[in-house]
Amino acid sequence: MAQDIISTIGDLVKWIIDTVNKFTKK
């Protein structure tokens, strides 16, 4: 259960970082 939550948060963090990188590169 905790493992699923951690992996979900990890995916969310990766997505946020990717999105921020796209905006900051412009």
From Swiss-Prot:
**In the record, what terms sit under GO molecular function?**
toxin activity
Disulphide bridges: none
Would the keyword Membrane be found if you checked this record's keyword annotation?
A: yes
Major subcellular location class: secreted
**One GO biological process term:** symbiont-mediated hemolysis of host erythrocyte
Read off the InterPro entries from this record.
Answer: Delta_lysin
Alphabetical keyword list: Cytolysis, Formylation, Hemolysis, Host cell membrane, Host membrane, Membrane, Secreted, Toxin, Transmembrane, Virulence
Query: What residues bear N-formylmethionine in this entry?
Result: 1
- Listed GO cellular component terms? extracellular region; host cell plasma membrane; membrane
Is Transcription regulation set as a keyword in this record?
no
Report the subcellular localization: Secreted; Host cell membrane
Assigned protein family:
Belongs to the delta-lysin family.
Function, as annotated = Lyses erythrocytes and many other mammalian cells.
Protein name (database record): Delta-hemolysin
Task: Write the gene name.
Answer: hld
